[in-house]
Structure formats: structure tokens, C-alpha cells
């Protein structure tokens, strides 16, 4: 049985990956979807070209991993793609967020880094030559971001982990792609807060276009997927310009 697994599938980028995977893989038997909101996953069944298997649960808790592990060991599927899309951010200074709710920033590290790593390790034995791992990073991974400090740091981890893991798995024919979009018009900003930076407002992208580009890039074997000219310029700019200068420029 050929499957794909998508975390964070109930909304935003994860939901869009589920919608488009049926076009990317013509012969998928199932997509296994993971998120906390079961009712959203059930509604997604009508939007997918491929049958869905629902795993409703919190990636910060052990239960969903056990359910997934049991299903993988029972079915022994050919896992064609793992999409690690679960994650969240919160804007504001470290001190401001700390005063609002102590655990938000450590939860961010748990979900964006620890859960992504745990999902990857759990799924690795079921990947074969031609399989893909797509990890949702962010353009914030390219450079430190004041007032988005913890989120940007977690996405730097995702980018670094993805690129190094991709090199390790290259000889097995497994591609790992880090998706690094700028601001995307999703529910993400309902929790994180609306972007205040003018450039971020002007470069807001649509989720379907970002996901379409990501799937094209992973099919081409690219280690990093960056959507849109502004973010590509940002990507190359962070390689050429001092990060101290870029950090200060973000405050304009």
C-alpha cells in the first residue's frame, strides 16, 4: 500500500498539501492525516482525491505516535511522502510573550522542532528509494528575526536538520526538502499576530501556490523550496549581507 503522511493537516499549509497530493501522486492508496481537530480532518475527506486515514491527536503527547507506530507496523506501507507541516509561531519580544503565557515559547520549540524530529525518526524505516520528506520551515530560517526570535530559531533548526538529513539519505534515493516561504495567507496569523513589517505585508503569498511550488521542487530533488521572487532575493541576500545589518533592517 502506497501512502503519504501529513501532520498539521487540519488547516493552513498542511490542509493544502492534502488537497494537492492526489494530483502529485496518481497512485496513492491513502493519505494519513494528523492533527488535533478531528472534525476538521473529517471535513477534509470531501476535499481529497485520495482516501484519508485520520489520526486525531496532539503531537506533544505520546498517544498519537503510538497509534501511528502501530498502524505502520501492521500495514508495512510504502511511504512515498512525509509532510511535516505541524507548527505555530507567536510574534512579540521574548519578554512580552513570557508575560502573556510562560509555556508558549517552549511549546513552540516542542512542536516545531521536537515533534518534527520525532515524526521523521518514526517514519524513516518505511521510506524507500524515491520517497520524499517535506519539512515546513520558513524564510525566517535564513536570518535571526527580532520579535519573532523563538519561531525563527526553530525554523533555522528545521532548515539545518532537513539539509543534513537529505545528504545522509541521498545515497538511498530519498529526497528531503525544506519549504521556506515568506508570509502565507493562512490561519497562522490568527495566533501569531498580524505581520507589522511592511515588506511582510506586501509579500503575503497564497497557500496553494506555495504548496504547488514545494511539490514541484521536491519532485526535482531540491533541498530548499523558496516561493516567489521577493523571498528568493531574501534567501540570496542573507548569504551575501551581514546578518547584523539585516537584523536591524527588519525594524524599519
Please provide the spans of the model-predicted regions.
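Residue(s) in the substrate-gating loop at a strand-loop-helix junction
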Residues: 138
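Active-site helix of classical SDR
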Residues: 120, 154
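Conserved mid-core segment of classical short-chain dehydrogenase/reductases
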Residues: 73, 87-106, 147
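Conserved glycine-rich Rossmann-like NAD(P)H-binding loop of the short-chain dehydrogenase/reductase
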Residues: 25-43
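C-terminal helical subdomain
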Residues: 178, 198-235
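Conserved glycine-rich cofactor-binding loop
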Residues: 10-11
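Rossmann-fold cofactor-recognition segment
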Residues: 48-63
Amino acid at each position: 500500500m502506497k501512502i503519504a503522511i501529513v501532520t498539521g493537516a487540519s488547516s493552513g499549509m498542511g490542509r493544502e498539501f492534502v488537497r494537492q497530493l492526489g494530483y502529485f501522486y496518481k497512485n496513492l492508496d491513502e493519505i494519513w492525516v494528523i492533527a488535533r481537530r478531528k472534525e476538521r480532518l473529517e471535513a477534509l475527506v470531501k476535499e481529497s482525491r485520495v482516501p484519508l486515514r485520520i489520526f486525531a491527536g496532539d503531537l506533544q503527547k505520546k498517544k498519537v505516535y503510538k497509534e501511528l507506530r502501530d498502524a505502520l507496523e501492521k500495514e508495512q506501507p510504502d511511504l512515498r511522502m512525509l509532510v511535516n507541516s505541524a507548527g505555530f509561531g507567536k510574534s512579540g519580544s521574548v519578554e512580552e510573550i513570557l508575560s502573556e503565557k510562560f509555556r508558549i515559547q517552549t511549546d513552540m520549540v516542542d512542536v516545531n522542532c521536537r515533534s518534527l524530529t520525532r515524526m521523521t525518526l518514526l517514519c524513516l524505516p518505511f521510506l524507500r528509494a524515491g520517497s520524499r520528506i517535506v519539512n515546513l520551515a520558513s524564510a525566517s530560517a535564513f536570518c535571526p528575526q527580532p520579535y519573532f526570535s523563538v519561531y525563527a530559531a526553530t525554523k533555522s533548526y528545521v532548515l539545518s536538520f532537513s539539509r543534513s538529513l537529505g545528504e545522509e539519505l541521498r545515497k538511498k534515493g530519498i529526497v528531503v526538502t525544506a519549504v521556506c516561504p515568506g508570509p502565507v495567507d493562512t490561519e497562522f496569523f490568527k495566533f501569531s499576530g498580524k505581520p507589522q513589517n511592511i515588506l511582510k505585508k506586501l509579500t503575503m503569498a497564497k497557500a496553494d501556490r506555495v504548496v504547488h511550488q514545494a511539490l514541484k521542487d521536491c519532485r526535482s530533488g531540491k533541498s530548499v523550496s523558496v516561493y516567489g521572487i521577493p523571498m528568493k532575493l531574501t534567501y540570496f541576500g542573507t548569504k551575501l549581507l551581514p546578518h547584523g545589518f539585516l537584523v536591524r533592517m527588519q525594524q524599519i
